[in-house]
A protein has these predicted regions:
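Conserved acidic residues
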Residues: 14, 100, 147
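Short beta-strand segments enriched in small/hydrophobic residues
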Residues: 14-15, 40-48
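Hydrophobic alpha-helical segments within soluble ligand-binding/sensing domains
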Residues: 17-41, 55, 84-86, 134-137, ...
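Short, solvent-exposed amphipathic alpha-helices that sit
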Residues: 24-28, 51-70, 84, 88, ...
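Hinge/cleft segment of the Venus flytrap/periplasmic-binding protein
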Residues: 44-48, 52, 63-67, 73, ...
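Rossmann-fold dehydrogenase core element
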Residues: 144-151
Length: 197
């Protein structure tokens, strides 16, 4: 494939920059377990079969299921849709009044889950985590409406891509896959992420 009006052609890829979706799920679940100790947890997925959704779900399940005293009571898709996530969270707390945490596979669904719990007067005592580290999620963490999120750092992603291109242009060797660094944002460290994108 060649760029229109250019002699530059792409014959093969020299490397791939990505995010470890399973690691995001593991990090969220680990932080949740450290906070709740034991109890019932639930996972609200994105689109079933999508790489981000499956990776984050599998990572979280691995941590939850390997922790004694933690029970995964529900794993259900909400298709990245806020209304579906709202409904799923509302149903979860009605069916499991002793629920300790909900891990949502992105912040949009986590914000909706938080709203559902608040509307059902059930937020107190239930942790809500998402993924992406959006401004809305960070504000919700500051305000106590969410409890954590895992970064999906777009600015770091862009900088890493530029560094990769510079190295390639200088003939330097690249790893086949380069993973972006990730961080847990929670109520303890939220102030450190002001202005983080």
């Amino acid at each position: 494939q060649c760029l229109v009006g250019s002699e530059m052609c792409i014959r093969d890829r020299d490397g791939r920059l990505t995010v470890d979706f399973e690691k995001q799920g593991e990090m969220a679940a680990t932080d949740i377990v450290e906070r709740i100790g034991t109890g019932k947890v639930a996972i609200i997925q994105g689109i079933s079969g999508a790489a981000q959704s499956e990776g984050r779900t599998n990572g979280a399940k691995k941590v939850f299921e390997s922790t004694e005293g933690v029970e995964v009571v529900s794993v259900q898709p909400a298709d990245w849709d806020s209304q579906k996530a709202y409904n799923a969270a509302a149903d979860l707390v009605k069916a499991n009044p002793d629920l300790k945490a909900i891990f949502c596979c992105n912040d949009v669904m986590a914000l909706a889950a938080s709203e559902a719990l608040t509307d059902n007067k059930a937020k107190e005592g239930i942790l809500i985590y998402g993924v992406d580290g959006t401004e809305e999620a960070k504000n919700a963490i500051k305000e106590g409406r969410m409890d954590g999120s895992i970064t999906y750092p777009s600015s770091v992603y862009a900088k890493a891509a530029v560094v990769m291109l510079m190295k390639l242009s200088q003939g330097m060797e690249m790893d086949d896959v380069v993973y972006c660094p990730l961080d847990v944002i929670n109520t303890d460290n939220i102030s450190e992420f002001d202005g983080y994108k």
